[in-house]
């Protein structure tokens, strides 16, 4: 008799994806972050669902409904902080996952990589809209400043902004539609994530050496399921430590003040995971130029596969490219720091230099390092 997991139409799909999946025998802990992102997504959908049961998307009551969740709803405070800090964990895993893809040359799986970049964009949009929902000062002004960037688009910009706002300023209509989109987008993300996996399983996973591993594969279960469970436990431990000891450390104190259109906060800044892009935006004095740089800072990921010049796929045996990669990581950390600083000397010039370095590394220095390494190895 055939095993049910191999014959049942539905269970068969799960079996081929998570149980009998042939997996390279040498993938390291850097490959754990895909499953961690899946766990983060499930956690965000579940906590978000329970928050949506008590939240009211109305300018008059949104702020107090969040306070009500924290004070009056059973375990509402932990649900709210799991959701808020879960987003931070999501982005930490996401940045590591993308970094892994760049380091080990996983971007050569074009479809998987492109869907991943679309996923990144969708996630950023979802997180931005979620930040607006508590309707604190930073929520309101963040929404105003970021949506206003679209007015830099020639000819249609102003109309586009007013269309998104649903009026002449960020108001009730904006909050309602942001809540609607924030609710629906995670399900779209889930569909995209399944497509991402579908394309990945067409080619099979990459591995640290970047060499095809078809002759040396092992079943996903039990070897990698147990490894993933360890990663999940560590993620939950880190998240709970954050939620139970310092839940507000990554937030902005200004968001505990109800939104007031008549009073601008001294420093408007987004959540920490957008600060690198925000720093790039601010480093260009021209509005349209800044918006273009902001969009290109993420869109450059789409052209990375076409800038791969090395004869080797992975950076595992390429010390020069490794230096460039870690310089890029340091540069992104610098940009994140600059994004949270006021616009004054010396932060302006540091931000501009870091922004130039970011694009130079991706578009010029990393491809150049690949060419130099090929020549050194006489390939």
From Swiss-Prot:
> Keywords for this entry?
Electron transport, Heme, Iron, Membrane, Metal-binding, Mitochondrion, Mitochondrion inner membrane, Respiratory chain, Transmembrane, Transmembrane helix, Transport, Ubiquinone
Q: Which residues bind a ubiquinone?
A: 201
Q: What is its subcellular localisation?
A: Mitochondrion inner membrane
* Membrane spanning residue stretches: 33-53, 77-98, 113-133, 178-198, 226-246, 288-308, 320-340, 347-367
- Membrane topology annotation: Multi-pass membrane protein
Q: Which GO terms describe its biological process?
A: mitochondrial electron transport, ubiquinol to cytochrome c
- GO terms under cellular component: mitochondrial inner membrane; respiratory chain complex III
- The entry marks the following residues as binding heme b b566, namely 97, 196
Any one GO molecular-function label of the UniProt entry: ubiquinol-cytochrome-c reductase activity
| Requisite cofactors | heme b
Subunit-structure text: The cytochrome bc1 complex contains 11 subunits: 3 respiratory subunits (MT-CYB, CYC1 and UQCRFS1), 2 core proteins (UQCRC1 and UQCRC2) and 6 low-molecular weight proteins (UQCRH/QCR6, UQCRB/QCR7, UQCRQ/QCR8, UQCR10/QCR9, UQCR11/QCR10 and a cleavage product of UQCRFS1). This cytochrome bc1 complex then forms a dimer.
Q: What else is known?
A: Heme 1 (or BL or b562) is low-potential and absorbs at about 562 nm, and heme 2 (or BH or b566) is high-potential and absorbs at about 566 nm.
The entry assigns this protein to a family as follows: Belongs to the cytochrome b family.
Its job: Component of the ubiquinol-cytochrome c reductase complex (complex III or cytochrome b-c1 complex) that is part of the mitochondrial respiratory chain. The b-c1 complex mediates electron transfer from ubiquinol to cytochrome c. Contributes to the generation of a proton gradient across the mitochondrial membrane that is then used for ATP synthesis.
Q: What is this protein called?
A: Cytochrome b
Which organism's genome codes for this protein? Ceratotherium simum (White rhinoceros)
Organism lineage: Eukaryota, Metazoa, Chordata, Craniata, Vertebrata
